[in-house]
Structures are given as structure tokens and as C-alpha cells.
């Protein structure tokens, strides 16, 4: 498929999505460090959790508004809020004011606004793609996001110390561009509803409050069993992925002996556990950026069932090795294997999600689906505690159980007879 054949909205949203992830990685990745420096580690933890909770509220509110009022309006509200709060944070961090409390308040509202806009962005991609184009679109989007995260983290790392106000100012300027692109270049894509009264309020119900409409809309999403299975699979998949910066990262820093990763004559590359963790993260990002589009071309004729089963299996196996191995080159090979599994699975899973989501409730579905990241963060954090009790092979076995559950959920969704039964019960 030629990229020029994609819907204009889609081309704009992919470009805008790259800039959004770049800015988010450039600034937000360092907010926990900023808060810890200003308020101490214990207080910073509570402040970050508060931001996460408000982000969940923003996601659900944005999902409801986008289905009720349209994608474009929701995007404009969210992106304008992000722009204004970045500007407020930049002013509050300047030498003329320097108010960490105002910076935090701006951060809080910023994450709410960004979360508010996110489901509308995801739903708009579904609105303007076809089942035939979605794997390519999601592959391109996945590649773009990883590239943006890599560059953003690099820029933020160099500019954070001594130039945080500049970072916030650049972010404010970037979000002006994003909001302007949405205002001038994006058209509304919300599908026309044939039965709006039934869609918004439920069949036969009188007009009620906004909260009742909100609850009824999400009740229908939670009753969709096939969607629930995919949500469980996505949550466990993300829980495994986050192990690298949680339990596995702790294990490598604590247990991995310093070793030569490469030796040529008298020259050698010697790494410890923390350095090995950085190399593994960089390897995963570089491989995704380098191989995502190639993987799409190579695997486009492979059946979805095979891609999802094999992808989940390779992904899980790679992380199981990371949980137990203390040999640098084995860890590097495991990272390659898990990245191949990731590239096989993720675009197909996203396309499958797009196919099962009803047009009238797309943003509500995407809002609930995006909560898998929040739940996975909690699971990954708990794994650090579990890992203090279980030996490394026990954690590897736990990852294996996660992987089996993922494949089981895929089987239930992809098997025609099982899928029909799920639809009948939904």
C-alpha cells in the first residue's frame, strides 16, 4: 500500500504522534527526578501516583466525550490544555519565579489533558483505516513512536541538567504546532449514529444525567467478553515488557558480575549490570526502529494466528532468559528474540482490536484498552516485591505463566467457534 493513499487525517496524526511522543519523552521522563529533587523520594512517589490516577480519569472522560461530541473537539481541548500547561510549567520553573508547586500543578493538569485527548487520537486512526491497511498503519505508527521515544530521551538527558526551563519552553512551542495542525488540517471522523438515543443512553431509558450516560457507555464496553480477553492479553504482555525496568533491571544491577562484553586484543568493552541494562534497552529500541517496516514486509503473508502465537511465545521466552542469565551475550541474543516476538505480535493485536471495536463506541473502547498500561505498571512494580521472595527461575516461570495466558486468550478470540460463543454471550 502506498503511503500517499492513506487518509490525510492519518498522515497528519502519525506526524503529530511522533512529535507528541518526542516531547513527552523529552520532558515527562524526567519529572519524577525533578519531583524527587524538590520534595524527596517518598513525597515524589505519592505525587506521581496522583498524576497516574488523574490520567485514568482523563482517559475515561476523553473516551466518553469523543464518542458523544466528536474526535476533533476532544483533540483540540486536550492539546490546548497540554500547550497551556507546558507554558505555565516553563514560566514557573524560570529563575524569575521558580515555583515547584506550580510546576507540579501544571504537570498534573498536563497529564490529564494528554490522557483526555489520547482515546480520540486512537479512535480517529480506526475511523480512517480499513482492515486491509491497519497492519501497515500500526507498524508505521509503532516504528514512529519508538523512534520518537529514543530521540526524546536522548535530548532530555542532555538538556535536563541546567536547561529544564528550556525543555519546557520547547515542549510548549511544539504543542502549539500540534494544536494548530489539529485545528487546520484535521477533519471530524466520528461515524454517524443511526440510533443516537440508544447509543448514548441505552435502549428505552429516559434522558438522564451526564454521569448516567458516562456509566452506561462504559458498562457496555465492560460486558464485551472478546474485548475483555484481548485486554487481559495486552495487560499481561505489557506487564512482561515493563519487567526490564523493574525486576530484571534490579536483578541485573544487583547480581550481574562485571564482564567483558567484547575483547579485541588489548581493547575490551567491560560492563556491569546497570550498563548492561542500558545496552539492552538501547538494543530493543534500535532493533524496533530498524526492523519494524522490514518485519511487516516479511510477515505480511503469515497468518495472524501464527504471528500472534509465535510472537507471544518468542517475546515471553526472551524475557524468561533475561530473568535468569548472567552472561552478556546470552542477554543480547534474548533481547533480539523478544524484539522479534514484539514485532510479530503488536501490529496484529492492534489491528485485531480495531476490527472488534464497534464504530459507535470506539473511543470508549480505546480509553478502557489504554488502561492496560496503568494496570501493567502496578503488576510490574509488584514483581519487584515478588522477586525478593522468588529466585530468578521462579520469576522466569511466572513470566512463562503470563505468556501461556496470553496465548490462551488469543486462542479464545481467534478460534471461530470460540469467537462466536463469546459474541453470543456478549
Where are the regions a protein language model picked out?
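Juxtamembrane intracellular "pre-TM" segments in multi-pass secondary transporters
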Residues: 1-7, 189-231, 426
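Helix-loop boundary and gating motifs at the non-cytosolic
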Residues: 2-52, 228-233, 237-266
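Hydrophobic core of transmembrane alpha-helices in multi-pass small-molecule transporters
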Residues: 18, 98-116, 330-344
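Central cavity-lining transmembrane alpha-helices of secondary-active solute carriers
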Residues: 46-64, 282-294
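Conserved MFS/SLC helix-loop-helix module at the cytosolic interface between two early adjacent transmembrane helices
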Residues: 57-94
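Cytoplasmic membrane-interface "Motif A"-like loop-to-helix N-cap segments
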Residues: 68-80, 299-312
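C-terminal ends and interior cores of transmembrane alpha-helices
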Residues: 80-97, 314-326
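Cytoplasmic helix-loop-helix junction between adjacent transmembrane helices
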Residues: 106-145
